[in-house]
Amino acid sequence: MFEDMDPYVILLIFVAVILAVSLVAAFLPRMMKLDMRQIHLMVALSAGIFLGILFFMLLPETFEEAHEGGAGAMDPVLWIVGGFLVVLFVDVIVKRMHMNKCACEECDDKDHLHEVTSLTAFIGLAIHAVVDGLVIALAIGHGEALAAVVLVGISLHKFADVFALSSIFTLTKIEKKKTLVFMIAFILITPVAAILSMPVVDILEDFAIFIPLAVATGIFMYVGIYSLLPEAFHERRDSLKSLAIVVAGIVAIALIAILLGDAHGH
């Protein structure tokens, strides 16, 4: 797919694809004019896609790269836990600071809780987006085959990232202009991080790519399980629908992963 291409041309293709995917994902929830129940079902779909990407793409790719790089069995596990704990720490601090500022009667208000959830999800996914940029630069430096797989994988979970974040923001009463600024900033993080990482790829050519992959996996795990799943089941009357949609999202990504695996194998 990328044979004999200049690395910076490949990078431009990555940036163009990721920006296009991100813009579509950002505006879909707003264009569909959904009510609260439907938005929560969309978050359920995002959660399913997140979990599918986590279990069928990020985890296998992380352990495969660790094995090929000669790392020990526990090395990727430690980095995954590290990524998870970093976002957990940030989440706890942000919520603590935010709750200290609010009036007691506001803290249990649904709109207020949605605002806090959107903020912590943004922070977690922003950290993940920076790591994605580094992974893109390293993948391009490691060869065309890995770059193609990473492009498909990151495009898929970038769609899930942006769609989920945009859906969560629609649940809040934050001003549209402010949420638009947040979304534009988030969409630009990965391309900017990739561009800034490219000049140092040669310096990092012996850098173990499984490390940023593992950190990204830990962050993805936290946001998917801790932020999105609870929000997906927020409407108890739709719990069975949400469950079915989460499972459908997981199965869809599993099928895509199988197809990509077959294509990569050939």
Annotate each PLM feature.
Residues 1-266:
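Intrinsically disordered, metal-sensing/regulatory segments
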